[in-house]
Amino acid sequence: MDELTAIHKGLFEGVFEDAGKLRTSNTTREVTNDRARAANPEAFFPAGLIETGAHNIAMELADKRNLHALDRDVFVHAFASIYDELGYLHPFRGGNAMVLRIFGSRLAHDAGWDLDWGSVAREEYRSAKHSAYRGDTSALETMFDAILRPANPTRVFLIAGWNQGPAH
């Protein structure tokens, strides 16, 4: 959770009053004009349990050795699942998608893969996330498979004020 809050604070300090702070109220997916979606809003993880949920995801990642040394197809499947869980966690009032992309990119990089987000259209991303919220991560897997490549060891993720741990 510390890394997610540090990323959020680094990105949104001076933009959001609550930058780096967990949301304190329950929320659903964004307001939409799509009647089918609006008629059945999907709630995110309960606000009072965010830290517990984050701990559970961290334990899952630890059990899976942070997705290190996995073959591509196994990595894509496991990464899509973790990405979905983090999306459902939705720890902040705003800015979750950007935080998730950065955290996910770092997780992938540390596991030996890089993600090229430049080729992902906004609607493709949103559609894949919403399908995953309903239990189908196949669109996320397809998207990640298309943008995944072996890691460039010289790539570094820098965000001012974010303690990134040991140098890569």
Where are these regions (language model features)?
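FIC/Doc superfamily catalytic core
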Residues: 1-168
